[in-house]
Amino acid sequence: MGIRSYKAYTPGTRNRSVSQFEEIVQSKPEKQLTSGQHRKKGRNNRGVITSRHRGGGHKRLYRHIDFKRDKYGMLGRIVSIEYDPNRNARICLISYQDGEKRYILHPRGISIGDQILSDTHAPISPGNALPLTNMPLGTTIHNIELQPGKGGQVARAAGAIAKIIAKEGKFATLRLPSGEVRLVLQQCLATIGQVGNVDANNQSIGKAGSKRWLGRRPTVRGVVMNAADHPHGGGEGRAPIGRKRPLTPWGRPTLGRKSRSRHKYSEALILRRRKNA
């Protein structure tokens, strides 16, 4: 995927860069695999904001992605590679031998006409899905299950890639994109290869309006709020936060404070925390 940079025609294009969308071959999605999407704008069932800075954005259709890859033993052919407004990764439409069509995440290097397979003993090639127990050490994978049959939950973003570094007993040891080293059951399914659109992180938004198109509202610093609205607020003029450490709007320590519960069931499966934790 290429990145297109703009010249400074306006202040908004001065540092703007976007994807060239050169791998996309179809503009309209498969109708039977889409549905309308009610955007909650960060509100819960009572209308109270539970996730700040969300709202607006362009209207979208939701594409139903096959994260389970449960068409076992049936060859599928790549029909098209499409844009998905709900994620950074591209998606590709698969047509199976029985006529069924499904969307999957687009693996890097896969092109139209290629065949993929989901099976216990599928070949080790990009796009194929099989259990971790049948993959050799050093295999690069994505769309990894954490519970057998639940569907892929890890390494699904654009450019995401994980690696099998060891196997022992019923667990495989994986190095995840975040740098975390974790144990996963060998019966869990994963897809070979790396998620496509690897340059997604190299794009520069360029202007605030681009974030609004994506449904992201402005973030206001706590230090410029009133004391009633944020622990950092108040004071005369440009004042410091007046605290020993930064706090969230609800008074909890932040910016470096670990927030993960020590009593999570999966704590014993994490051998090394992620890099920024």
From Swiss-Prot:
GO terms for cellular component: chloroplast; mitochondrial large ribosomal subunit. GO terms for molecular function: rRNA binding; structural constituent of ribosome; transferase activity. SUPFAM superfamilies: Nucleic acid-binding proteins, Translation proteins SH3-like domain. It is found in: Plastid, Chloroplast. InterPro entries: NA-bd_OB-fold (IPR012340), Rib_uL2_dom2 (IPR014722), Ribosomal_uL2 (IPR002171), Ribosomal_uL2_bac/org-type (IPR005880), Ribosomal_uL2_C (IPR022669), Ribosomal_uL2_CS (IPR022671), Ribosomal_uL2_dom3 (IPR014726), Ribosomal_uL2_RNA-bd_dom (IPR022666). GO terms for biological process: mitochondrial translation. It comes from the Eukaryota. Residues 24-57, 226-266 are annotated as: Disordered. Keywords: Chloroplast, Plastid, Ribonucleoprotein, Ribosomal protein. HAMAP family: Ribosomal_uL2_B. Belongs to the universal ribosomal protein uL2 family. Part of the 50S ribosomal subunit. This is Large ribosomal subunit protein uL2c. It comes from Zygnema circumcarinatum (Green alga). The lineage of its organism: Eukaryota, Viridiplantae, Streptophyta, Zygnematophyceae, Zygnematophycidae.
